[in-house]
Amino acid sequence: MDHPSREKDERQRTTKPMAQRSAHCSRPSGSSSSSGVLMVGPNFRVGKKIGCGNFGELRLGKNLYTNEYVAIKLEPIKSRAPQLHLEYRFYKQLGSAGEGLPQVYYFGPCGKYNAMVLELLGPSLEDLFDLCDRTFTLKTVLMIAIQLLSRMEYVHSKNLIYRDVKPENFLIGRQGNKKEHVIHIIDFGLAKEYIDPETKKHIPYREHKSLTGTARYMSINTHLGKEQSRRDDLEALGHMFMYFLRGSLPWQGLKADTLKERYQKIGDTKRNTPIEALCENFPEEMATYLRYVRRLDFFEKPDYEYLRTLFTDLFEKKGYTFDYAYDWVGRPIPTPVGSVHVDSGASAITRESHTHRDRPSQQQPLRNQFSSSTNQTSNLK
């Protein structure tokens, strides 16, 4: 299948957030080029590689003025499908007011690369799922779901659809940080404006679109080649919630001779799996959620509050306390910066969004601190 080219406080810091390029990419005076010390912008030192993807590399970095660790995404300027600048533009469009979005500190050229410097976060939900023996309790899933509905509502309020729901793209904050309990959304490399910036109208309904996203979680309509809109992000979230509760989804592990055939099998199995069967032995609210989002019209604005209330009412009915005592709390979490615990955020970037998978992930732990890829494609997970 062809991969479409995209349509596409904690502390005060000395650098302005979202500072755009000033063509800084240098080696600090006193350090020889052979030392491998590289600077991005006026004060970000580039450190070890902590991930990679089709877009380039993810590096651990350090703000030499504040001594804070950061994540640095490097994309070759001559990339065949450059997307880092577009992702930066989407981060600017989202702004810094929304909860659960990484801070972006800098964007600019760096030698043969474009570089984006972001807040270093903790591990991804996929990493934590592995840590918890690949099953989350209902309480943990509901705390995740309630937050992610708010994240997606915020993204949609900024005229963007996300189009890349997968556990690797949702990260907790760094351990010891006041935001360590917050579920963050990262990697806007496949995002798209669903409101035309010129006409201010919703994009038109189209068919025969190439797949964009991760096959395991994408909506049924995406498999059918239909243009994505807000409803598809919410359906993909529903599939991910059931993945966390069940441990796997019925359309995982399907074999086929070609990627196109495998996508077809995944879509067919998804369509032929009744919601009742998918959600069997779990609270009815999970099935109600999926029925609602699958019935939404292409242009329709979802009732986010109704969906959140489904889950908050269930949460209260079960007698849970929203104390952020997730299943992974108390378990040791590896980190890319040695003793600085959960910076695990520095998980590796496996934006397989550009390599296709449909089997249990076999990446090293902490795959997705900023798993942004730069190509758009569907991930067979």
Swiss-Prot record:
Serine/threonine-protein kinase. Casein kinases are operationally defined by their preferential utilization of acidic proteins such as caseins as substrates. It can phosphorylate a large number of proteins. Participates in Wnt signaling. Regulates fast synaptic transmission mediated by glutamate. Phosphorylates CLSPN. It comes from Macaca fascicularis (Crab-eating macaque). This is Casein kinase I isoform gamma-1. Belongs to the protein kinase superfamily. CK1 Ser/Thr protein kinase family. Casein kinase I subfamily. InterPro entries: Casein_kinase-1_gamma_C, CK1_Ser-Thr_kinase, Kinase-like_dom_sf, Prot_kinase_dom, Protein_kinase_ATP_BS, Ser/Thr_kinase_AS. The active site is at D164. The modification Phosphoserine is found at S344. GO terms for molecular function: ATP binding; protein serine kinase activity; protein serine/threonine kinase activity. Residues 368-381 have a biased composition (Low complexity). Its EC number is 2.7.11.1. Residues 1-36, 351-381 are annotated as: Disordered. GO terms for cellular component: cytoplasm. Keywords: ATP-binding, Cytoplasm, Kinase, Nucleotide-binding, Phosphoprotein, Serine/threonine-protein kinase, Transferase, Wnt signaling pathway. Disulfide bonds: none annotated. SUPFAM superfamilies: Protein kinase-like (PK-like) (SSF56112). Autophosphorylated.
